[in-house]
Each structure stands twice: as C-alpha cells, then as structure tokens.
Amino acid sequence: MSKFLSFFRSGFLAVADLLFPRRCVVCGETLLLYEEHFCMHCLAELPLTYFWTYKETGAFVSFYGRVHLESLYSLFYYTESYRRAIHSFKYHSNVRLGYYLAKMLGERIGVSDIDYIIPVPLHYRKKWKRGFNQSEIIAEGIRAGIVAAISKMEQKGVSNDSKENLSTPVVLTKVLGRRKFTGTQTQREKMERWKNVEFAFVLNRRGAKKYNLNGKHILIVDDVVTTGATLDACANILQQNFNCRISIATLACVE
C-alpha cells in the first residue's frame, strides 16, 4: 500500500509540476521533481556560515558588552541572491521554505543542552497583516532539526550517561510580547534600529510563570541578524528577569 501511495504521490507531483511549475527561489529556474525550493546548483552554492562549528564569529563578537551569549548560529549569509529566500518566506507566505531552512539549521546545531526556544514576538498588527510570525515558524523548524539530530544519535547507539544529555527543547511563544509597533528595520541605519526597538518588548509574566526559566539555556530565534538590536533587546529582558543562559539563532546573517 505504501509503495502505491508513493507512486501515486510521485505521479501527482509530476503532473502538478507540468501545470504549475515550481521555481527555484534564488535563480527562478524550474525545479526538477526531486528538488525542493532550490535547484541543485543554488542549494550547493548556499553561502553557509558554519557558525555551528566555531564560537568566536564576527556576529558573536558584536554582542560583547551588550549581552552575554553562549552561542550564535546562522545558517547562511544574507547575500544579494540568497536574500530572495528570506523575502519569499516573509513577504510571500512561503512558510514551507522557512520551516525547511530552519530545520536545516536545527540539524546543524544538533544535540545540545538548549531547554527552550523563544521566537522574537511580532506585533499583533503585523502578524494579522502577514498571517503568521516568521520567528515562530523558524523556532518550530529548528526544534524539528534538533529532534532529528537526536534521533540519529539514538539510532547509532549512545550510552545511558549520554542519553541524559539528549535534551529536546520546548518552543515558548507566550514569554515575550511586543507592545510597540516598530515597522520594518530593513531601511534603517544602525542607530535608528536601536532606537526603533527601544522599549518595544515586554516580559509576559503570566506566560513566563508557567515555566522555571532560572538556570535554563534559552535559544532566541529570528530571521536575520544585522546590528543585533532586536535580539539584544529580547535577550536583555530575559537576563534581567531570570538567571538564564542565552544563545541566538537566525536563518541568515549580514556579513
């Protein structure tokens, strides 16, 4: 039965591709049946940061003196060509693409001691207009990637001591809130970005009191890190209220 369903699905996708060809989000070329979101060439050329392999990155160092970070992860550099992937996700409701990239990042973060994943909150007006909070999609994708990495490790066989360290993070969407409508940060200069998010975020005490965040390792996620103003503001609120460790993850990073 499963072979029949697989054959039927492949046939359906083949017909759908003929009627409604899928395009690579970077170059616009028609995708082959086995390709997803990116053509093979553009996927191979994805400008990975490899931040998950070392700590002292330029983006990580830029937070010195502002907030103490455990780690900073970004999947790829926000280049002229590959920013189209972020735009497709955020502004054209390509939620599957955002989840796909986030899961890819989560698999690279791999097994860790992260307890909670907190997405940067979106103002209700912007969420209503867009229909979703992109950071929440990213958070769920990263979690799925980490779970997949844990599953692979368990299949390989690990000791009982190691199993105790296999932590499956929980996504928390009600801990931080956004009380100030700030508009887009895209066209703003560095100092404008900082002023734009000043007092924009607030701790949702009703949501936070359900969880003991003291002593926990929290991963804050967003789509792109540029100056770090938004992520810095969120991290400061958490560290001012809880004795917690903070890491940051984004799909893309401006060089």
Where are the regions that the model predicts?
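Glycine-rich phosphate/pyrophosphate-handling loop used in enzymes and phosphotransfer proteins
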Residues: 1-255
